[in-house]
């Protein structure tokens, strides 16, 4: 089957931004003007094509990265609309990994907002060329040039306007294209009647000034153009387009456009710019990978190269399990067998589809540069490489951030336990930032994710898609107990109930052990006061008592016990009697050894703009945190602290609120430390049922 579009005329792009900047509305207008949909769907009406999950339509936010194919000016454009909420950062991350170019949407009023910085950093991580659409120019307070300045200063990007708005706020009537040096005036509300006209007299001077600056900026990136510009003092439209494109591909220039997607102004010009300036698969560096012998290799964007693709998303839907793939090289055919080189497993390609949000079109093959989905894969998960068995390669995978919040989950009815397990397995296959584990001590199922909204929506999906009602609670903190002093303990177990009785007697010395030793047992019995066969059971009795502690039922750690004396009975002594005696001696001794409660301490690192440094440190201190270090570099502050795990629940939400969404943090286990007396008393009282 021949190609519908040559690779040079394919664009794989993402639309990404801060929440509420108008990404999904922009995508909807692109689909409308390019003929994919014949009626405009609005996000606030719950009718957007790319927002096809129930929760997306209810909440008016984009949760999953919806992939859509359309065409414009004889080019195939594959678009991914990504969420702007920080809880769904993996959707942006995996999109950036497989895209060739990005349209970053900014609000003309809000400008560079918190999530825009995060998205920009993600695009930087994968070196994705980009252009900017300053949206919502119809809103009160819209300021195109101010936003352009913010992008330059806060994102350190060489952003340059290639358009100017004619009017603003309620009077946005058209757009000046500085490249063609023409004005485009909108004559109807639907944005379909556009008049190409000369630049209005009152804006000629401003347009001339910005066009001259644009020519100069473009020429600086190209030796050939700088000579022409110095010789003739200007560049032609074609030369400007060539220079802008080169600047975008080399990451030396970010063209900035303007308009209002909601008011149907500027979107067709955005599509023109995608075709003119963003890269085709052949314009970006070939994908790198590792061969079975450990050597690095590349796969060029070429139908004739060995097949390779990256699975960047797995989704369960009513039609079955869909695996989204980015084709990097070769051809993938329906019915063929391929290798999952990441897992060293063979896979069969049952069906292939390209998507238009929740609609799909079956195809016989996918080719280099395509974004599509595969049905029938059993072992493939996000980040896996698919390739030919003859030419195996493992492609660079994607960065998967660690979850930052966790909660306990259980089904509302015991009969739903199996359904809950299946739901959790399916959801964790789809989303690599959603982790499921079982707490070995509490036996609770614990789910972890990127934020409270993330987990809330996953629990909601369990109900809608898997018909499982679940109770959600805070996870139990894994406290521990230990001792701070030494003492002796004695346990004597004697029972006589007719016939053979029970008798066991041990004397022990207890003391704190080295940190990390857990339970340490030493036998110092001499003279056979306790026969050898009873020493093991006595030790086991103590060890088992360790598992449930003496203060609040938590495991006792770092305790050294020395068996020093005891007695036995020739007839009545037994292993069980000595096991019970060992437990009694342990409980007797530990009460006299100043037992204390320990809590897990977490190593926390917080990164935020330095404006929020004081708030971040103050908040960590209020959580019983100990600040261990801080630094400020290029407007960004980093704080290192040790904070009790018990105080970190809800921190992701608090940090986001405190830093306007611009703070990020990482957290890992450090060590156990003693719980302050007042906190310990409350925990012990609660666990003993006195609360």
From Swiss-Prot:
Keywords: Cytoplasm, Elongation factor, GTP-binding, Nucleotide-binding, Protein biosynthesis. The keyword Iron does not apply. Gene3D superfamilies: 3.30.230.10, 3.30.70.240, Elongation Factor G (Translational Gtpase), domain 3, P-loop containing nucleotide triphosphate hydrolases, Translation factors. Residues 8-282 form the tr-type G domain. It is found in: Cytoplasm. GO terms for molecular function: GTP binding; GTPase activity; translation elongation factor activity. One of its GO terms (cellular component) is cytoplasm. One of its GO terms (biological process) is ribosome disassembly. InterPro entries: EFG_II, EFG_III, EFG_III/V, EFG_IV, EFG_V, EFG_V-like, EFTu-like_2, G_TR_CS. Signal peptide: none annotated. It holds the Pfam family GTP_EFTU_D2. It comes from the Bacteria. GTP binds at residues 17-24, 81-85, 135-138. The keyword Cytoplasm applies. NCBIfam families: EF-G (TIGR00484), PRK12740.1-3 (NF009379), PRK12740.1-5 (NF009381), small_GTP (TIGR00231). Belongs to the TRAFAC class translation factor GTPase superfamily. Classic translation factor GTPase family. EF-G/EF-2 subfamily. Catalyzes the GTP-dependent ribosomal translocation step during translation elongation. During this step, the ribosome changes from the pre-translocational (PRE) to the post-translocational (POST) state as the newly formed A-site-bound peptidyl-tRNA and P-site-bound deacylated tRNA move to the P and E sites, respectively. Catalyzes the coordinated movement of the two tRNA molecules, the mRNA and conformational changes in the ribosome. This is Elongation factor G. The gene is fusA.
